[in-house]
Regions:
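Generic hydrophobic, helix-prone segments enriched in Leu/Val/Ile
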Residues: 11-17, 36, 40, 118
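A short helix-loop-beta-strand connector motif used in the catalytic cores of GNAT acetyltransferases and
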Residues: 35-51, 56, 62-67
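Acyl-donor binding region in acyl/amide transferases
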Residues: 67-137
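Short linear motifs in intrinsically disordered
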Residues: 2, 33-39, 108-114
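Generic structural motif
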Residues: 3, 58-60, 118
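Short amphipathic alpha-helix that is part of the acyltransferase structural core
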Residues: 1-32
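Short linear motifs at secondary-structure transitions and domain/linker junctions
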Residues: 19-25, 31-36, 61-70, 93-97
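Short, charged interaction patches at domain edges and termini
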Residues: 139-142
Length: 142
């Protein structure tokens, strides 16, 4: 399989994950495909598989202060790689939340070092922002 086919198959797997959640059913596959191009092109994503089937997906962005403010207000990422503030954008799990959280803690602790902030914005099924949270990377996650 060539790299382009592999990328297309991965994005297709992720679209299936998105489409399994009610909040994304109104979006077309084309809309989701276009949305996913940025994190895929920047390699700011991880797909989890269980029994050779996609089970979870996470993507993230690195924002500067200006884009971070916009993201916290709108929930929209306009520039996925413009700063050093890490935001977990989408965390979707069909049946693999534990593995996804464990991987995320380890990955960002190794990438950023200990004591660094990782942020996330929680949005409900009606696209209303209901919580902005953060966690701190730890040595024990490495």
């Amino acid at each position: 399989m060539n790299p382009l086919e592999k990328r297309f198959n991965e994005i297709s797997d992720v679209i299936r994950i998105y489409k399994s959640f009610d909040k994304y059913k109104e979006h077309t596959k084309e809309e989701l495909f276009n949305y996913l191009l940025q994190p895929f092109n920047l390699k700011q994503y991880k797909i989890f598989y269980k029994n050779d089937k996609p089970s979870a997906f996470i993507c993230w962005c690195f924002l500067n202060e200006e884009y971070e403010e916009h993201f916290m207000i709108t929930g929209e990422v306009n520039n996925w790689n413009c700063g050093n503030r890490v935001w977990l954008v989408d965390l979707l799990s069909l049946n693999d939340s534990r593995n996804m959280v464990k991987w995320t803690n380890r990955y960002f602790s190794k990438l950023l070092g200990v004591g660094k902030k990782v942020n996330y914005l929680r949005i409900d099924d009606n696209w209303n922002k209901y919580r902005v949270s953060s966690s701190v990377t730890k040595e024990c996650y490495k």
